[in-house]
Curated annotation (Swiss-Prot):
Annotated stretches, region: Disordered: 28-56, 461-591, 1005-1141, 1959-2016
Effect of residue 187 to I: In BRGDA1; loss of function
I repeats: 113-420
Effect recorded for residue 367 to L: In BRGDA1; uncertain significance
Gene: SCN5A
Protein name (database record): Sodium channel protein type 5 subunit alpha
Lineage: Eukaryota, Metazoa, Chordata, Craniata, Vertebrata
Impact when changing residue 1219 to N: In BRGDA1; uncertain significance
Length: 2016
């Protein structure tokens, strides 16, 4: 025991001596002896004690907890005894360094020689633990990295290299000497990071001393030294751990990906083999056939092969160096005149893009999956094979690319989430141990109190573990820290400590349980640390403050030591002024999640005392609320109360080490609290005093009054509004800069800049005066403002000297000041900030990876790139690896997802295998894993709640107050004017506001149901007045604000309520709502009850509330916290709302009523609104009179027509027809006269039909209903467009410009289909709900991008021009020939030179946005970057890589502008999805986790039913075959053969030898024969049942097709496609095998996720198709005649509908949109010809840039950013659901297995089995349902109901077994009823049965019968014995008479008298009457039947089985 109870302070450290070693060996021997006895005990089944575990806070490389105090100086670096009890029986010792880091060593001999006491080993240990040693190694690594990054190192670096090797060798030697080599724990090679060091050193020596030929390859391994940084920095180790974990998790996804890619690659191989070599070759004439020479254009080639392989004979694609591909099918690319399509030369892209063999096809598919440059492959393939193969690409892109790549994201995100959960679990574990420790110490304390020991005077560790070091020590430590400047003075900064388990863990424990911060007061009561007090919600005590503690620490402590720092009273020095809020408080109970540097999310500050975050219950068991009756007289009432127990128990300490472990747990938290307390004093006291003396200016009264005046102005909301407007204006001014500005304009901008700089400087100055510098600089925003102002002033000063555009760009940061008043931007910056914080370590890891790969690339490939130098100019290609910067750029480009083109270059210079390896490694590790981890982090720190209801701060409210004031002013003016006008006409009614002011209204809380005030009746526009105006705060009126403001109880969140409003108001519930309105009286008076308003009015009010700003979130929160507001309960209907969304009534009930009402009322509504009728009384029609009656009848008829389902079907048909007609209006329409005429007539017809439909609906529904429905509005507008164009055509204005552009709007017709298709409507609803959030993010994106755009304009405006010689193509001239624009124009004598600009440039902010969009989507970004990098100056000729480091601008933009902001779209959409789900799927929210489990199990259970198995044939041979076919092994064999067949197909290549073709054909025949055999055998065995299985039908079809294909292969191949495709389809059968393999669970989960996603994905696909359709119609109307260049050519263009669809499908993934936009940006010569005549009568092949840019950017935002991200959101969502399902205890497969086994026991599918076979059945099941034998007792205990014939129903068994797996739960019974109903519905055939008994009751009956029998036998025996004894005595002559006989009549007497010679009593037979026999069973039952019946029924209804516990011995008897 003594070993474990370590005293406090220095005495806890003992030197490690030989005695210590001997003690350890002794303990080891004892443990071994104990081990043999425990083994014996475990064999006997006795419980084992829990194995000890190492302590988390005493792990190696952690910091020693403060509990142990500071080790004395002489023990630093010396071997000490291990503090962790876990190692007490292991040979280890620890060493501490100055930083108190723990190093653990093995106490065995190192290298067999050096004992722990050997001087050499001691010296090595001292060196190893020294912090300088670590720093030396770190510096060496970094220096080494710098040297490695040199691309052409000078010769002397060789010696530096030797130095590095020497240092690394020294490091390893020290480690080996100190630790030992590898035999024991904690030795050198036991740490995996040391393997890295070891291999690096071995490599270094190998390359030096052994000549291995290619040394550079081996030398590249030196780069792994960079990884050593990871082993040195502990934080990096954890993140690498997470990465490795996620890679492990990726195994399943990888397998699935490889499988899918293989299947697609096989399909590609079969479809496109050899196609990509088809080229347009110049026509030739074959000369004499003998030698095969050919002639073309007067030149002769010796053979056809030579001719075909000569690149000169191929046609090049327009304006590029690519060869034009073609194909021989009808819809493939064609060749122009003079060329023919032949298979010649190599494949495109240096021969690397092809489907000629499986490997190349696989690479092509991988490229397609990662979507790198896939549009090129798509265009090449479609051109050579045909447009129909777009379907193949759609499949691969949607299934392969979107699904698989996002699965990787989902898996990585889940791995990250799991790691987070693990951290939280670890923290909870600590918390548990902490509580144990507290309990234990409390017990000890109680025991000592009882014994009368003076606990107060003791200061040992036992009494005061929470105050480890005495106050002097701590004070000096703090002073030391302050003097060294390590204490941070930042605002609101959480302390970081070296110990990861210390304060960082504190972040996870949500200790900050906010009690009302306003009422925090210090308590003076002191007591021991274990005194417990009654906690009242209004009080919080402080930490013990060392400085003020008079009696020293030993005397006592403050009671609330565990209350964390953010909730403590701020010390006097740091008391915030009334003007500023104290930092660090958790406001409004919002949980703020912070992310620490490891990316671990921690929850800080929960205002809710019942916070649900892990660790929130930390203090509950410790700070007990003591019952009042335990207060002893000695204690003052209300003071702290002692927790005493009647029987003090210290048994917690009996177990060795338990107390030590407990104390260690306490230490984890206390050391954290210690540091938190210290960090509260942010600055040293002297600094504080200095600051308060000189930075708070309160000198004289005059100054104070000036200050007050300034403060009044500066703090006024209007000032804030003015400043915000200035920021916006300033931003606008900066955005107005552009290329070619006039001097006046430039001057205006400069003056503007001066003015704004002045305004902001003044603002800062006045704020400093008003607030004093001390308080001014305590707010983050103020610091930010001041920095920007200072930079602006610096820029003004320096701009005179030089043109520093760098400083100008700092002005752009002013844009961020908007974040103060724009919550979304603020939140977004916080998210990025959080992520950057979290990503700190991850970024480092990524940087290391990038560095390593860049150096590897440079070392391996650098030298080879010199071969690629341009022969003329001697320039390298843009992308090379000759130096580190370029190598870095290539790696960065790969991380952006572009790897294939740089890899082709690499393969050209360095060979294929190495390049493939390196590039694919970077791609997989960097892009797919690390970047996805980034994204996972981003998504985890993202929550839509932030974006929709952001945190409020004072400034923002100020802005809204200002706006509210302006509104109030306007309202006042308006009201005054109105009153004045009305006053002249009539008396005005009293205003409600006035009433409220006089106190006449019951409450100031106006509910959304309160009737509109009378004013609104007069003036509809001012109806807004009834609701709370934007920006107003209840009770927060500005000074001098006379009237209180009425507010709704809860204001709905904008994004959700808009959604609801949309659904209620516009998406199809209109008919019902109208019917409901019909049945309710319409009343607008103030006395109308709330419910009297119609539904549309309700929704109108809801929509108006939805507009109310988010500023009310604060108040809502307050409302939530207050128990009841006065006056709230006075109106029964308007109860106080708890949440932020106020439900007016129960919406569910409302919705339920609607259909019923709809059935009663089939009448139309009123035509006009009440307002219309009031103004125009003629609108009101009297339906009782004659004309009105007819009108009413007509309306009813129309109503019935419109409501009829056939009408709707007809309209849908017409919509589809009219949309289809639009697709024919292409470029060839003029040539097809008949079609044109037909379309014109059709167009008129459609217009008439739609106009008629509209008129019918007007008459039927009335204007009011028609025009309150969004979908009807859409129809109305589209019909209007058709009508206008029809009228214009009739009047002959068809050719007018505006009419033409209006005609293009007909493309919107398909939108009408949206409201008609349910699936699409769901998706659109979700989208409409997401629009507010999406717009928010889009706006923030634009702000972010604005900064980069303005910076781009500053850097590149006017620099993207170049002088080009037309005759030499588009290459710019050398700058030595032409230097600038003016020279170019002066040299342009022939008209061949001209000055041109890159089309997408930075000449103004708008153009900059387009350029940035291209960079962000990585399309077209190369040209922009090249132009930027080559730019020299304003209007100067570019020079190759003149401005090389401009690449950095793009790198930074890609990281922040593309990576963060574009991925936020995914975040928003995912979150929105979750919100929609919460709103729609009610059950999930109201179910506990436990209930969900049951619910899911039941859902699966109910959908199944027992099926009849296929009967085994009676024929002997058939039966034998049947047995073989139904075995699992047979299936597996067939699968194996299928895979083998695939392998043989993979072997095929293009141009294979005849022998190979022959062999493969034979193998194929063999497989066809085998599969045909399988089919025949199965048919024979299964007979007609064969066709009951869908897989069998599938197989049958494939076999038939294979046979047909083999027989007719030549014909099919000639006219259709390769029949081998059928065999590829057979791969689908692999899906079957996954069910059989239990191990493939992960892959099953992934496929299950896909299956779950399919319905939703289909809907999204439909929506996407609709968008594509509309855009392709627009494209045909606007871009049909643009010039063919860049991405537009003869196949990919907007001339026909099909071609437009090809283009738009390509852009859906944003691929190649720059190429399509490029020709549209042409505006005139020399790029295009505006005079060129077109077929439709128009002229020119120029584009319209504005329309083009709008067209492409909107399409990309809609498809690429929104719709495709919805796809991703659904996959992520379903993946998490599927994973949850797979981790549930019971899966679908378990139920399948149950029924499969059931079939064997119930072959007739009766749904019953006999009770006798139940035991066998339970044993035959697989886990987890299986109950292994012996299982009788368990089965009996289940109390299964039985029917007559002792049969049990399958549902009952399955339910009982499920219950056993999931455990007992209260919800089971309700679910059981639900399940039975479901089962009955699914199986109507289920025999209705009445159970007559249950298994348990049957057992009870059997046991009862046996007990009764035994008792009766015993009773008979006793009586017989008595009688026998009587007879014996009588015979012995004891003089006993007959009367004394115990049995004178009855059975015993009779039998006895029979057996004995002498009869007893008279031999008369009458004595043996029937009654003398024991009563028969029947008679008893009859007599007591009632009684029994009651008990029986009671029993049968008994819920609790525990009422009838079967005793164990009874059971044993029964078994016997």
């Amino acid at each position: 025991m003594a070993n474990f109870l370590l005293p406090r302070g220095t005495s806890s450290f003992r030197r490690f001596t030989r005695e210590s070693l001997a003690a350890i060996e002794k303990r080891m021997a004892e443990k071994q002896a104990r081990g043999s006895t425990t083994l014996q005990e475990s064999r006997e089944g006795l419980p084992e004690e829990e194995a000890p575990r190492p302590q988390l806070d005493l792990q190696a490389s952690k910091k020693l907890p403060d509990l142990y105090g500071n080790p004395p100086q002489e023990l630093i670096g010396e071997p000490l005894e291990d503090l962790d009890p876990f190692y007490s029986t292991q040979k280890t010792f620890i060493v501490l360094n100055k930083g108190k880091t723990i190093f653990r060593f093995s106490a065995t001999n190192a290298l067999y020689v050096l004992s722990p006491f050997h001087p050499i080993r001691r010296a090595a240990v001292k060196i190893l633990v020294h912090s300088l040693f670590n720093m030396l190694i770190m510096c060496t690594i970094l220096t080494n990295c710098v040297f490695m990054a040199q691309h052409d190192p000078p010769p002397w670096t060789k010696y530096v290299e030797y130095t590095f090797t020497a240092i690394y060798t020294f490091e390893s030697l020290v480690k080996i000497l100190a630790r030992g080599f590898c035999l024991h724990a904690f030795t050198f090679l036991r740490d995996p990071w040391n393997w890295l060091d070891f291999s690096v050193i071995i490599m270094a020596y190998t390359t030096e001393f052994v000549d291995l030929g290619n040394v550079s390859a081996l030398r590249t391994f030196r780069v792994l030294r960079a990884l050593k940084t990871i082993s040195v920095i502990s934080g990096l180790k954890t993140i690498v751990g997470a990465l490795i974990q996620s890679v492990k998790k990726l195994a399943d996804v990888m397998v699935l990906t490889v499988f899918c890619l293989s299947v697609f690659a096989l399909i590609g191989l079969q479809l496109f083999m050899g196609n990509l070599r088809h080229k347009c070759v110049r026509n030739f004439t074959a000369l004499n056939g003998t030698n095969g020479s050919v002639e073309a254009d007067g030149l002769v080639w010796e053979s056809l092969d030579l001719y075909l392989s000569d690149p000169e004979n191929y046609l090049l694609k327009n304006g590029t160096s690519d060869v034009l591909l073609c194909g021989n099918s009808s819809d493939a690319g064609t060749c122009p005149e003079g060329y023919r399509c032949l298979k010649a030369g190599e494949n495109p892209d240096h021969g690397y893009t092809s489907f000629d063999s499986f490997a190349w096809a696989f690479l092509a598919l991988f490229r397609l999956m990662t979507q790198d440059c896939w549009e090129r492959l798509y265009q090449q393939t479609l051109r050579s094979a045909g447009k129909i193969y777009m379907i193949f690409f759609m499949l691969v892109i949607f299934l392969g690319s979107f699904y698989l790549v996002n699965l990787i994201l989902a898996v990585v995100a889940m791995a990250y989430e799991e790691q987070n959960q693990a951290t939280i679990a670890e923290t909870e574990e600590k918390e548990k141990r902490f509580q144990e420790a507290m309990e234990m110490l409390k017990k000890e304390h109680e025991a000592l109190t009882i014994r009368g020991v003076d606990t107060v005077s003791r200061s040992s560790l036992e009494m005061s573990p929470l105050a480890p070091v005495n106050s002097h020590e701590r004070r000096s430590k703090r002073r030391k820290r302050m003097s060294s400047g390590t204490e941070e003075c930042g605002e609101d900064r959480l302390p970081k400590s070296d110990s990861e388990d210390g304060p960082r863990a504190m972040n996870h424990l949500s200790l900050t349980r906010g009690l009302s911060r306003t009422s925090m007061k210090p308590r003076s009561s002191r007591g021991s640390i274990f005194t417990f007090r009654r906690r009242d919600l209004g009080s919080e005590a402080d930490f013990a403050d060392d400085e003020n503690s008079t009696a020293g620490e030993s005397e006592s402590h403050h009671t609330s030591l565990l209350v964390p720092w953010p909730l403590r009273r701020t010390s006097a020095q740091g008391q915030p002024s009334p003007g500023t809020s104290a930092p660090g408080h958790a406001l409004h109970g919002k949980k703020n999640s912070t992310v620490d540097c490891n990316g671990v999310v921690s929850l800080l500050g929960a205002g809710d005392p019942e916070a649900t975050s892990p660790g929130s219950h930390l203090l509950r068991p410790v700070m007990l609320e003591h019952p009042p009756d335990t207060t002893t007289p000695s204690e003052e009432p209300g003071g702290p109360q002692m927790l005493t127990s009647q029987a003090p128990c210290v048994d917690g300490f009996e177990e060795p080490g338990a107390r030590q472990r407990a104390l260690s747990a306490v230490s984890v938290l206390t050391s954290a609290l210690e540091e938190l307390e210290e960090s509260r004093h942010k600055c040293p006291p002297c600094w504080n005093r200095l600051a308060q003396r000189y930075l708070i200016w309160e000198c004289c009264p005059l100054w104070m009054s000036i200050k007050q005046g300034v403060k009044l102005v500066v703090m006024d909301p209007f000032t804030d509004l003015t400043i915000t407007m200035c920021i916006v204006l300033n931003t606008l001014f900066m955005a107005l800069e552009h290329y070619n500005m006039t001097s006046e304009f430039e001057e205006m901008l400069q003056v503007g800049n001066l003015v704004f700089t002045g305004i902001f400087t003044a603002e800062m100055t006045f704020k400093i005066i008003a607030l004093d510098p001390y308080y001014y600089f305590q707010q983050g925003w103020n610091i930010f403002d001041s920095i920007i102002v200072i930079l602006s002033l610096m820029e003004l000063g320096l701009s005179r000297m030089s043109n520093l555009s760098v400083l100008r760009s700092f002005r752009l940061l002013r844009v961020f000041k908007l974040a103060k008043s724009w919550p979304t931007l603020n939140t977004l910056i916080k998210i990025i900030g959080n992520s950057v914080g979290a990503l700190g370590n991850l970024t480092l890891v990524l940087a290391i990876i990038v560095f390593i790969f860049a150096v590897v690339g440079m070392q391996l490939f650098g030298k080879n790139y010199s071969e690629l130098r341009d022969s003329d100019s001697g320039l390298l290609p843009r992308w090379h690896m000759m130096d580190f910067f370029h190598a870095f750029l290539i790696i960065f480009r790969i991380l952006c997802g572009e790897w294939i083109e740089t890899m082709w270059d690499c393969m050209e210079v360095s060979g294929q295998s190495l390049c493939l390896l390196v590039f694919l490694l970077v791609m997989v590790i960097g892009n797919l894993v690390v970047l996805n981890l980034f994204l996972a982090l981003l998504l985890s720190s993202f929550s839509a709640d932030n974006l929709t209801a952001p945190d409020e701060d004072r400034e923002m409210n100020n802005l809204q107050l200002a706006l509210a004031r302006i509104q109030r002013g306007l309202r006042f003016v308006k009201r005054t004017t109105w009153d004045f006008c009305c006053g002249l006409l009539r008396q005005r009614p009293q205003k409600p506001a006035a009433l409220a002011a006089q106190g006449q209204l019951p409450s100031c809380i106006a509910t959304p149901y309160s009737p509109p005030p009378p004013e609104t009746e007069k003036v509809p526009p001012t109806r807004k007045e009834t609701r709370f105006e934007e920006g107003e705060q209840p009770g927060q009126g500005t000074p001098g604000d006379p009237e209180p403001v009425c507010v709704p109880i809860a204001v709905a969140e904008s994004d959700t309520d808009d959604q609801e409003e949309d659904e209620e108001n516009s998406l199809g519930t209109e008919e019902e709502s109208s019917k409901q309105q019909e049945s309710q009286p319409v009343s607008g008076g103030p006395e109308a009850p709330p419910d009297s308003r119609t539904w549309s009015q309700v929704s109108a009010t809801a929509s108006s509330e939805a507009e109310a700003s988010a500023s009310q979130a604060d108040w809502r929160q307050q409302w939530k916290a207050e128990p009841q507001a006065p006056g709230c309960g006075e109106t029964p209907e308007d109860s106080c709302s708890e949440g932020s969304t106020a439900d007016m009534t129960n919406t569910a009930e409302l919705l339920e009523q609607i259909p019923d009402l709809g059935q009663d009322v089939k009448d139309p509504e009123d035509c006009f609104t009440e307002g219309c009728v009031r103004r125009c009384p003629c609108c009101a029609v009297d339906t009782t009179q004659a004309p009105g009656k007819v009108w009413w009848r007509l309306r009813k008829t129309c109503y019935h027509i419109v409501e009829h389902s056939w009408f709707e079907t007809f309209i849908i048909f017409m919509i589809l027809l009219s949309s289809g007609a639009l697709a024919f209006e292409d470029i060839y329409l003029e040539e097809r006269k008949t079609i044109k005429v037909l379309l014109e007539y059709a167009d008129k017809m459609f217009t008439y039909v739609f106009v008629l439909e509209m008129l019918l609906k007007w008459v039927a529904y009335g204007f009011k209903k028609y025009f309150t429905n969004a979908w009807c509005w859409l129809d109305f507008l589209i019909v209007d467009v058709s009508l206008v164009s029809l009228v214009a055509n009739t009047l002959g204005f068809a050719e007018m410009g505006p009419i033409k552009s209006l005609r293009t709007l007909r493309a919107l017709r398909p939108l009408r289909a949206l409201s008609r298709f349910e699936g699409m409507r769901v998706v659109v609803n979700a989208l409409v709900g997401a629009i507010p959030s999406i717009m928010n993010v889009l706006l923030v994106c634009l702000i972010f991008w604005l900064i980069f755009s303005i910076m781009g304009v500053n850097l590149f405006a006017g620099k993207f021009g170049r002088c080009i010689n037309q005759t030499e193509g588009d290459l710019p001239l050398n700058y030595t020939i032409v230097n600038n624009k003016s020279q170019c124009e002066s040299l342009n004598l022939t008209g061949e030179l001209y000055w041109t600009k890159v089309k997408v440039n930075f000449d103004n902010v708008g153009a900059g946005y387009l350029a940035l969009l291209q960079v962000a989507t990585f399309k077209g970004w190369m040209d922009i970057m090249y132009a930027a990098v080559d730019s020299r100056g304003y209007e100067e000729q570019p020079q190759w890589e003149y401005n090389l480091y401009m690449y950095i601008y793009f790198v930074i933009f890609i990281i922040f502008g593309s990576f963060f902001t574009l991925n936020l779209f995914i975040g928003v959409i995912i979150d929105n999805f979750n919100q929609q789900k919460k709103k729609l799927g009610g059950q999930d929210i109201f179910m506990t986790e436990e209930q969900k489990k049951y619910y899911n199990a039941m859902k699966k259970l109910g959908s199944k039913k027992p099926q009849k198995p296929i009967p085994r044939p009676l024929n002997k041979y058939q039966g034998f075959i049947f047995d073989i076919v139904t075995k699992q092994a047979f299936d597996v064999t067939i699968m194996f053969l299928i895979c083998l067949n695939m392998v043989t197909m993979m072997v095929e290549t293009d141009d294979q030898s005849p022998e190979k073709i022959n062999i493969l054909a034979k193998i194929n025949l063999l497989f066809v024969a085998i599969f045909t055999g399988e089919c025949i055998v199965k048919l024979a065995a299964l007979r007609h049942y064969y066709f009951t299985n869908s897989w069998n039908i599938f197989d049958f079809v494939v076999v038939i097709l294979s046979i047909v294909g083999t027989v007719l292969s030549d014909i099919i191949q000639k006219y259709f496609f390769s029949p081998t495709l059928f065999r590829v389809i057979r791969l689908a059968r692999i899906g079957r095998i996954l069910r059989l393999i239990r191990g493939a669970k992960g892959i099953r989960t992934l496929l299950f996720a896909l299956m779950m996603s399919l319905p939703a994905l289909f809907n999204i696909g439909l929506l996407l198709f609709l968008v594509m359709f509309i855009y392709s119609i627009f494209g045909m109307a606007n871009f049909a005649y643009v010039k063919w260049e860049a991405g537009i050519d003869d196949m990919f263009n907007f001339q026909t509908f099909a071609n437009s669809m090809l283009c738009l499908f390509q852009i859906t993934t944003s691929a190649g949109w720059d190429g399509l936009l490029s020709p549209i940006l042409n505006t005139g010569p020399p790029y295009c010809d505006p005079t060129l005549p077109n077929s439709n009568g128009s002229r020119g092949d120029c584009g319209s840039p504005a329309v083009g840019i709008l067209f492409f950017t909107t399409y990309i935002i809609i498809s690429f950013l929104i719709v495709v991200n919805m796809y991703i959101a659904i996959i992520l969502e379903n993946f998490s659901v599927a994973t949850e399902e797979s981790t549930e205890p019971l899966s679908e497969d378990d139920f399948d297995m149950f029924y499969e086994i059931w079939e064997k026991f119930d072959p007739e599918a009766t749904q019953f089995i006999e009770y006798s076979v139940l035991s066998d059945f339970a044993d035959a099941l697989s886990e987890p349902l299986r109950i292994a034998k012996p299982n009788q007792i368990s089965l009996i205990n289940m109390d299964l109901p039985m029917v007559s014939g002792d049969r049990i129903h399958c549902m009952d068994i399955l339910f009982a077994f499920t219950k056993r797996v999931l455990g007992e739960s209260g919800e089971m019974d309700a679910l059981k009823i639900q399940m039975e109903e479901k089962f009955m519905a699914a199986n109507p055939s289920k025999i209705s049965y009445e159970p007559i008994t249950t298994t348990l009751r049957r057992k009870h009956e059997e046991v009862s019968a046996m007990v009764i029998q035994r008792a009766f036998r015993r009773h008979l025996l006793q009586r017989s014995l008595k009688h026998a004894s009587f007879l014996f005595r009588q015979q012995a002559g004891s003089g006993l008479s007959e009367e004394d006989a115990p049995e004178r009549e009855g059975l015993i007497a009779y039998v006895m008298s029979e057996n004995f010679s002498r009869p007893l009593g008279p031999p008369s037979s009458s004595s043996i009457s029937s009654t003398s026999f024991p009563p028969s069973y029947d008679s008893v039952t009859r007599a007591t039947s009632d009684n029994l019946q009651v008990r029986g029924s009671d029993y049968s209804h008994s819920e609790d089985l525990a009422d009838f516990p079967p005793s164990p011995d009874r059971d044993r008897e029964s078994i016997v």
